[in-house]
Each structure stands twice: as structure tokens, then as C-alpha cells.
Amino acid sequence: QFLLDKIEKIENKKHKAILALAYSTGMRVSEVCNLKQSDIDSKRMIITIRQSKGKKDRIVALSPKVLEILRTYHKAYWPKEYVFNGQFDLRYSERSCNQIVKQYLGKEYHFHLLRHSNATALLEAGTDLRIIQKHLGHASSKTTEIYTHVSTATLQNMNLPI
């Protein structure tokens, strides 16, 4: 809830779109920066992440809320090739994305936290670990297990056998 509250309050449309997209999809900072307009399919509500880590493509779901945020951003900035443009219509830099996280979430946070938080939120919502593994593009479920941090509230609400 902390991240959702923080993202909701951001007024800068580009910054809000970057953080909302990253948290919602679990995309890596490089994937967000390399994302092209043609990678977003708003009819099928999916995003194709091309040639990511391990040189593999993968597909992630696009939430209606994030699509709305992206459209609001797009109307304000009119990016061309890349979803998030930096100077001279080049892709937005990973350094800039990391600075956005620190600006809005705090200096102790980093962009990769959004990916971990996405995995944890999916697990706590009951998503199977194998689905999360595929969603994040992990070759091993061991890597996915590192990403998922079960909250104390989830442990307290567990249905114990006795």
C-alpha cells in the first residue's frame, strides 16, 4: 500500500507513469527504458518485453489503471519511438529512473525494489510461484523465491492446521 499511495500522489506525469508501470509489471529498469511504443498492445492489454536479460522475449499483463496513466502521460509528452523519451528523443536513462525512485520513495530505495514489491504483491494475492517466475522472466524458481518477501500480516492471517 505504501508504494500505491506514493505513486498516486505524483503529479509529474512521466515520473508517475514510469513508477506505476514498473511496480505493476515488475519490469527491470533497463526494460522500462528500452520499451517502445510498438511493444504495448492496448487491445490485448499486454506488453512485450523484447530481448531482456538472457536475450529472451516475454509478455506481461497491462492493467487498465496503468494504461490510463500511460495515456495521460502520452498526451502530455507525445513520445515517439520509446515510451519514455529522454533528451533528443533518445530513450530515457536508467540513471534518471533511479533518481525518480529516490525522489519519490526515499533515498534508501532503488528501482529494483519495485520489481521485488511486484513479486511479493502477486504472491500475497495468491498467484502461483511458477506464474510469478514466468512473469518476471526468471529461468529458476529459486531466483523468484528470493524476490518474494512474505509480510508479517500474511503470516498472521495464515490458516494453520491446528
Give the ranges of each region predicted by the language model.
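Conserved catalytic core of the tyrosine transesterase superfamily
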Residues: 1-162
